[in-house]
A protein has these predicted regions:
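Low-complexity basic/metal-binding stretches
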Residues: 3-18
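Conserved catalytic-core segment of NTP-binding enzymes
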Residues: 174, 178-350
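Solvent-exposed alpha-helices and their adjacent loops that cap or buttress functional pockets
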Residues: 60-64, 75, 91, 119, ...
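N-terminal phosphate/diphosphate-binding loop that engages ATP/GTP or pyrophosphate donors
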Residues: 86-159
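A generic structural motif
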Residues: 98-101, 289-296, 354-363
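Walker A (P-loop) phosphate-binding motif
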Residues: 55-92, 96-101
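Short, basic, glycine/proline-bearing loop/turn elements
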Residues: 67-73, 160-171
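Positively charged N-terminal leader segments that act as targeting/secretion signals
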Residues: 15, 20-37, 43-45
Length: 363
């Protein structure tokens, strides 16, 4: 990834917006394409004078999204900090429903041994968690319903916080269960459903679970800033694959045959380098469409994605959620840290969504 000179004071902070003749126009990064199809989201409309406020754009995106998930690429990525900012800062409108895939909210990270921020909720928040977690929080609880969803820590129940306080979460682990819990939240009066995603669960990008994804990354992922940025952008690209137009049923009858016959193929399982590279070498994959169920089914390297793009192969998905924002933490749990300004600037250069430093901008 190329280094770019930092903008002069007073210039736009976000690469997605440039001024031209007093108006704002969109600047599209080469990273915004896969197979020649632009899949970035429109950042903002021109609203007159003044400097573009990334926080305003972030709040707009969050408040227009009913179901969202927060996915961490590594430990200490700032996921809980972002979650607490959403839950308690008055930034999201209406009643919130909260659950987690896996356990979260404990005070110490069992992997790194570092102290973690607890999950703090406001009075009125709806929470779905396992029964064994109820004794660990300090909120006053009103049990609203049982779900019949089993976990190693007991059945998942839905409660309403009758006071502000800390909670610990252990929610469902299956997509259909998460969808069911979100639906229950809305039936009980929630305006928004938030899923605290487990580490590396890219499947939370599926439309069946969430409309939008908050991607959290940081220095704990790797000592190399270059690698952290490159891998984060790779995940961002996959999460933002364009939604596919409907394909005929016969488009699922074999990758090579369907591409030759229809110029498009529906890949029913995982899409891997082993499947794709031979077809690239043979010239079969050129100016065609490959459709997968959701981004979690794409197991391609960044290099292979670039090769598909060069051959004008459009990679699309039946179910997808857009990336709402990316949060970065320049401080690692393992003792190293990045230059915060360089890390933030380079990440903003590489993507077309708001990028927030959780250490400073969510205080």
């Amino acid at each position: 990834m190329r280094h770019r000179q930092a903008p002069e004071p007073g210039q736009e902070r976000h690469r997605g917006i440039r001024k031209k003749g007093g108006r704002r126009t969109k600047a599209v990064s080469p990273l915004s394409f896969c197979g020649g199809v632009c899949y970035t989201q429109k950042l903002t409309e021109y609203q007159g004078k003044g400097v573009y406020d990334m926080h305003d754009e972030l709040l707009r995106r969050l408040n227009e999204t009913k179901t969202m998930s927060i996915v961490g690429m590594c430990k200490n990525a700032g996921k809980t900090t972002m979650l607490n900012w959403m839950l308690t800062g008055g930034h999201l409108q209406g009643t919130l429903g909260l659950t987690s895939i896996g356990r979260d909210g404990e005070s110490t990270d069992v992997v790194t041994g570092t102290e973690k921020p607890g999950i703090f909720v406001k009075e009125g928040t709806l929470i779905a968690t396992a029964k064994d977690m109820l004794r660990l929080g300090d909120v006053t609880k009103e049990i609203l319903m049982t779900t019949g969803i089993p976990t190693p820590l007991g059945e998942v129940v839905i409660l309403r916080a009758r006071s502000a306080g800390y909670v610990q979460l252990a929610g469902p682990s299956i997509t259909t269960q998460l969808k069911s819990v979100s639906q229950s939240f809305f039936e009980l009066g929630a305006d928004r459903s938030i899923i605290d995603g487990a580490l590396g669960r890219k499947s939370l990008g599926a439309r069946a679970v969430a409309e939008g994804v908050i991607l959290c990354t940081g220095a704990s992922y790797h000592m190399s800033m270059e690698k952290v940025i490159a891998d984060t952008v790779h995940i961002y690209r996959l999460m933002n694959l364009p939604k596919a137009a409907e394909l005929p049923p016969e488009a699922a009858d074999g990758l090579e045959a369907c591409v030759k016959e229809h110029g498009a193929a529906l890949v029913t399982g995982a899409l891997t380098d082993t499947m794709v590279l031979p077809l690239l070498r043979s010239g079969v994959l050129r100016r065609c469409r490959l459709v997968v169920k959701d981004p979690s089914k794409v197991l391609l390297s960044a290099d292979t994605l670039d090769k598909l793009s060069a051959r004008e192969v459009a990679l699309e998905t039946e179910e997808a959620a857009r990336t709402l924002c990316i949060t970065v933490n320049p401080v690692s749990a393992y003792g190293w840290k990045f230059d915060k300004d360089e890390f933030l600037h380079r990440m903003r250069e590489a993507v077309e969504v708001p990028v927030i430093n959780v250490k400073e901008e969510l205080a």
